[in-house]
Amino acid sequence: MSKVIKPPGQARTADFRTLERESRFINPPKDKSAFPLLQEAVQPHIGSFNALTEGPDGGLLNLGVKDIGEKVIFDGKPLNSEDEISNSGYLGNKLSVSVEQVSIAKPMSNDGVSSAVERKVYPSESRQRLTSYRGKLLLKLKWSVNNGEENLFEVRDCGGLPVMLQSNRCHLNKMSPYELVQHKEESDEIGGYFIVNGIEKLIRMLIVQRRNHPMAIIRPSFANRGASYSHYGIQIRSVRPDQTSQTNVLHYLNDGQVTFRFSWRKNEYLVPVVMILKALCHTSDREIFDGIIGNDVKDSFLTDRLELLLRGFKKRYPHLQNRTQVLQYLGDKFRVVFQASPDQSDLEVGQEVLDRIVLVHLGKDGSQDKFRMLLFMIRKLYSLVAGECSPDNPDATQHQEVLLGGFLYGMILKEKIDEYLQNIIAQVRMDINRGMAINFKDKRYMSRVLMRVNENIGSKMQYFLSTGNLVSQSGLDLQQVSGYTVVAEKINFYRFISHFRMVHRGSFFAQLKTTTVRKLLPESWGFLCPVHTPDGSPCGLLNHFAHKCRISTQQSDVSRIPSILYSLGVAPASHTFAAGPSLCCVQIDGKIIGWVSHEQGKIIADTLRYWKVEGKTPGLPIDLEIGYVPPSTRGQYPGLYLFGGHSRMLRPVRYLPLDKEDIVGPFEQVYMNIAVTPQEIQNNVHTHVEFTPTNILSILANLTPFSDFNQSPRNMYQCQMGKQTMGTPGVALCHRSDNKLYRLQTGQTPIVKANLYDDYGMDNFPNGFNAVVAVISYTGYDMDDAMIINKSADERGFGYGTMYKTEKVDLALNRNRGDPITQHFGFGNDEWPKEWLEKLDEDGLPYIGTYVEEGDPICAYFDDTLNKTKIKTYHSSEPAYIEEVNLIGDESNKFQELQTVSIKYRIRRTPQIGDKFSSRHGQKGVCSRKWPTIDMPFSETGIQPDIIINPHAFPSRMTIGMFVESLAGKAGALHGIAQDSTPWIFNEDDTPADYFGEQLAKAGYNYHGNEPMYSGATGEELRADIYVGVVYYQRLRHMVNDKFQVRSTGPVNSLTMQPVKGRKRHGGIRVGEMERDALIGHGTSFLLQDRLLNSSDYTQASVCRECGSILTTQQSVPRIGSISTVCCRRCSMRFEDAKKLLTKSEDGEKIFIDDSQIWEDGQGNKFVGGNETTTVAIPFVLKYLDSELSAMGIRLRYNVEPK
């Protein structure tokens, strides 16, 4: 073998690692994961779910129940007669119900199962049994009477809660690949999804507004809030420690007033912002004025509006003089809204309003912090109105974060627990209203109440996962109620892994007509992949993270940062003035720490970055986001913003001063200078450089070979088609019961592949095969992207695939719950066809490997009530083989006889004419012909291509990457090496054509990849050199066997009489406008009539020649000795009316009406005339249209020729 040419200092080849992969497959590692990058890809999902039960405060769920607090009710009973007389305001005994602790158990079988060898339930069992993988949700209830006079505790089982795989509540957590295989899982099972009714469901990640950061917005809809409202506003999404959020908005009114808006239980409320300020702390108008205006006393625009703001409040609410009065006023107005307890004073209710609504991220004890932040927001609002700063772009990644699935799961669970407590109180209130004898101190009464309350919270969470619909009283501060979950489809591994890197903008934005939200903005560099997005209606809304982007799932420790900032010269925020043009506000996670000059702020930001990368300063986490916004003319509002919270997008870059890794976020990246390659670095300009340019691409986009040589839409198409490929969804297919699975039997590792291909272990799930491809117009069957396949290659397994289908047979569906079992698998003693035993065993179940066709029996059962043996038959028109038969026990785990089985079919799918194939460059096409080998062209070395494609596929698509892959694959096959196809490893000076051309020349082939070929039909040399190489091809799941529709007759629509649509309903194929135009353009009028009329809704209708109507014609009653005729009611006259019009002739004789002109309508009515009708052929839908228009008073008239 000749020596491979390698450029000095750059390795562009790799090993296939075939033996290493085989060894790892046979002997999975027992100590660690083989592919840690796969685990990192799903970490946001698992980490967010783990945070529910892990953390310094016992997890987010326990923080949530603390925020819920206690629910209170009074029984209205006096302690004794003296209390009733002396204290008329006595409410009775007080009952407080709260949740002390929440815990989620690992999935286990029921305790009553004595036959269970292993009580642990593993995911593979849930998949095969088509059940849900869930653990018990346990709530520790506290039943307190009269503020702790007597406390009762009880642990309640609130149903089975679906558990995320590989989370800390899953049995697979921390298992090695070897142990995973022992438990019937993939050796690298990544988890991150739920199993609901045997289906793998995933909570999709959503883009939401960045937390705890006030954002300036100009939105025309703000002006619709009321009179004098403008389109200016400041919006902040404030997030509690349990990850639930509350959005606060400041509205600017045209008269200078500012209104505070919030939403509570899907209702909006507006409060003057001065009222909120005066309720937060003891303050004066002077303090508010100084706090907002700062040093800008000479700014007349600001001072005039502040004066109007303060005077307007005093004029409207003259009776509110101090904080106590304001709190009481708020409490009085919101007592009913917040369902306050009767024993709470207005003052306490007002304080609760502030705690639950106003800037909740600052806590219940942060009134001063809330006061300062509101002043900052008001000042920013006035700057926006004055034009001093620009509005923030809510569609930019800088102002966005990710709503993780685990956090959303916890938010919904918290609300369901809150509803559970409300239902308990409602049940007690119902007993009180009915006058029942109740005793709060009686534990038996407590048990009776809890028995009558629906405790199955787990089923509600299972409903959310199975449907994706959010049933919420509050709306959870989200903009959509559906579309939260998707099926983690395992069509192939590319599609499966993409689900976990997918992020959606929200279904609300999908309905907008504007395209602003879909645009790819520069701020998303390195965080969202610019290539991996669908090309249809979700384009730009459904994105995928770059492969190096990760999401924070834990709160970084920022407790020491304030002291570090003070040591660097930040003035503490003891003075309540807002940042003017001369001062820079310093904030940490939405809390104002202090103030500093802008010059010093830049120095502090650079110093903090140096120290955090250096790693020698305690208290500075590496993932701290340091966003310094410098002052500018009408730019973003300046300040130094530090972030260390959850749900932030983060990515690694190299920090040049220390040559170490730095973690940056989207907010700070906008104001950083990051070079893409080391060659671009400029001294005193760039502070960072990318590790590699491919960090901006997603996992799938990185796998497209030489994508930098392709037109960008082709790379987008490949990201979509790679997920539609019939590949290898997994290895443990025998332990799955998916409704439909595709598997490529002849998958190969690509000769041309990127470095990340091996890092992510894609060879465990091959997605295609290497094919010898010739670019030649050879037969005429390759027009319009069609491709010709070598028939011998097809016979040797080229693209051979298999489809698996699973059918569940449940005899329990035929009886009600609790009824005795009357149907049993097997054969009875009655008479039944003995040929059934050819397919079925004596137990009534099919033999493994049995060939079944439509109508063949797949199982037999005996019905006691009918004393008869029945069978279930195979319904598909496509023959199959019985692959597996699984016996499924009852979900309640009660020991009883077999009632449910699942049968898996294996359906052969050899490539057929009409099946779709594609390369990895978006070059898709259907198989148009399987060409005999003897007629295929061949090269001088006797090689015949597997695939022939048309040269016209390249010029308009500009997929130069496919040319390069063909060269590289050919050279790699000749030298036995794997070629590196990572983007941007070549340039104009070092081209891939030279690099791979030299390899081909060393092997004795043409430098440019061309070869002389000989005609398979004549044996003569073709007059042109043919471009031949090795390209990795994919077989897509769009197969003709799943889509072809053929029918001569079949069901029709009862209204239009046209064939119904749908392959499953034996419907027809619609001949649309384009097909109609094509037939008209070709002048095939008879074919057009045949398709659109004769074979569709052909009907014969009677039309009146005189009035031109088809609706007024009617069949007459035939007379004796005559035939029935069709007459027109509109053009006829009643016989009685016709008699009155009789006239006499000149000679005095009467004129009689001819009997042939008289006809009856079948109801005894006689008519004269209206006989001028004829029969025409029309589409039935025309008659339907005529009747619909006539109902609206519109008449259609038809001209009939000849008259």
From Swiss-Prot:
Catalyzed reactions: RNA(n) + a ribonucleoside 5'-triphosphate = RNA(n+1) + diphosphate
Zn finger (C4-type) start-end: 1104-1131
GO molecular function, one term: zinc ion binding
Effect on the protein of changing residue 1107 to A: Lethal. Abolishes recruitment of RPA1 to Pol I. No effect
Gene3D superfamilies: 2.40.50.150, 3.90.1070.20, 3.90.1100.10, DNA-directed RNA polymerase, subunit 2, domain 6, RNA polymerase alpha subunit dimerisation domain, RNA polymerase Rpb2, domain 2
GO annotation, biological process: nucleolar large rRNA transcription by RNA polymerase I; ribosome biogenesis; termination of RNA polymerase I transcription; transcription by RNA polymerase I; transcription elongation by RNA polymerase I; transcription initiation at RNA polymerase I promoter
GO terms under cellular component: mitochondrion; nucleus; RNA polymerase I complex
SUPFAM superfamilies: beta and beta-prime subunits of DNA dependent RNA-polymerase
Ligase found in the keyword field: no
Source domain of life: Eukaryota
Keyword hit for Ribosomal protein: no
N-acetylserine modified-residue sites: 2
Subcellular location as annotated: Nucleus, Nucleolus
Keywords noted in UniProt: Acetylation, DNA-directed RNA polymerase, Metal-binding, Nucleotidyltransferase, Nucleus, Phosphoprotein, Ribosome biogenesis, Transcription, Transferase, Zinc, Zinc-finger
The protein's enzyme class: transferase
Phosphoserine PTM positions: 81, 1156
Listed CDD domains: RNA_pol_B_RPB2 (cd00653)
The enzyme's E.C. designation: 2.7.7.6
Subunit structure, interactors included: Component of the RNA polymerase I (Pol I) complex consisting of 14 subunits: RPA135, RPA190, RPC40, RPA14, RPB5, RPO26, RPA43, RPB8, RPA12, RPB10, RPC19, RPC10, RPA49 and RPA34. The complex is composed of a horseshoe-shaped core containing ten subunits (RPA135, RPA190, RPB5, RPO26, RPB8, RPB10, RPC10, RPA12, RPC19 and RPC40) where RPA135 and RPA190 form the DNA-binding cleft. Outside of the core, RPA14 and RPA43 form the stalk that mediates interactions with transcription initiation factors and newly synthesized RNA.
Other facts noted in the record for this chain: Three distinct zinc-containing RNA polymerases are found in eukaryotic nuclei: polymerase I for the ribosomal RNA precursor, polymerase II for the mRNA precursor, and polymerase III for 5S and tRNA genes.
Role according to the record: DNA-dependent RNA polymerases catalyze the transcription of DNA into RNA using the four ribonucleoside triphosphates as substrates. Component of RNA polymerase I (Pol I) which synthesizes ribosomal RNA precursors. Besides, RNA polymerase I has intrinsic RNA cleavage activity. RPA190 and RPA135 both contribute to the polymerase catalytic activity and together form the Pol I active center. In addition, subunit RPA12 contributes a catalytic zinc ribbon that is required for RNA cleavage by Pol I.
Family affiliation: Belongs to the RNA polymerase beta chain family.
Protein name per the record: DNA-directed RNA polymerase I subunit RPA135
Organism (species): Saccharomyces cerevisiae (strain ATCC 204508 / S288c) (Baker's yeast)
Gene coding for it: RPA135
